[in-house]
């Protein structure tokens, strides 16, 4: 299946989606003459980003799973924060690579970029919260012993049973005692 890719001054080309997402993005990047270091993605004509750039590089799923055949997509550059700074991984903007993009398209891309950045910050906060674990001193934590008190008790849990010879011995003693009393 094929899709149409629009870029620049109303230029377009066909792309086969029966390939891995990474291969597709690499091919599109080379067609629009962008360096390998630039991150790109595709957006629909409605302005909805496909977020293909978020997939792992070794992701082997076909692009046809995420893209509709015979549809038109715009190439967008994903702008990140300045390298070497704290905001290096921040999402600054999704810029369509069109000469004169529509204002509504820019607004739709800005809204999606802001939402993605908020999600990224939220994930960072959750990771930080997991790292910070309050450890109480051992004195305040009640220690649970293995169910025994300070008195020494037998470690045996089951009731004591006598074997057969023990019963016979006791019976014999009781009989002897009772017979002696009768006499």
UniProtKB/Swiss-Prot annotation:
Compositional bias ranges of the Basic residues kind: 170-183
Signal peptide: none
InterPro entries linked to this entry: CXorf65-like
Region of interest (Disordered), ranges: 136-183
GO biological process, one term: transcription by RNA polymerase II
Coiled-coil ranges from the UniProt annotation: none
Pfam families reported in the protein's UniProt record: Il2rg
GO molecular function ontology, one term from the record: RNA polymerase II cis-regulatory region sequence-specific DNA binding
Full protein name: Uncharacterized protein CXorf65
Organism, scientific name: Homo sapiens
Organism ancestry: Eukaryota, Metazoa, Chordata, Craniata, Vertebrata
Gene giving rise to this polypeptide: CXorf65
């Amino acid at each position: 299946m094929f899709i149409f890719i629009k870029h620049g001054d109303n230029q377009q080309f066909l792309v086969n989606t029966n390939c891995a997402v990474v291969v597709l993005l690499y091919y599109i990047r080379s067609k629009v003459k962008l360096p390998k270091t630039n991150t790109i993605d595709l957006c629909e004509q409605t302005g909805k980003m496909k977020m293909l750039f978020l997939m792992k590089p070794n992701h082997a799923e076909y692009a046809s799973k995420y893209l509709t055949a015979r549809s038109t997509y715009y190439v967008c550059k994903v702008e990140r924060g300045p390298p070497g700074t704290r905001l290096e991984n921040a999402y600054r903007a999704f810029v369509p690579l069109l000469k004169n993009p529509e204002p509504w398209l820019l607004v739709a891309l800005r809204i999606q970029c802001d939402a993605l950045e908020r999600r990224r910050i939220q994930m960072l906060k959750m990771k930080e919260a997991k790292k910070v674990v309050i450890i109480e001193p051992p004195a305040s934590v009640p220690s649970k012993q293995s169910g025994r008190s300070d008195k020494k008790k037998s470690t045996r849990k089951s009731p004591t049973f006598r074997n057969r010879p023990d019963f016979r011995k006791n019976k014999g003693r009781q009989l002897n005692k009772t017979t002696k009393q009768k006499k």
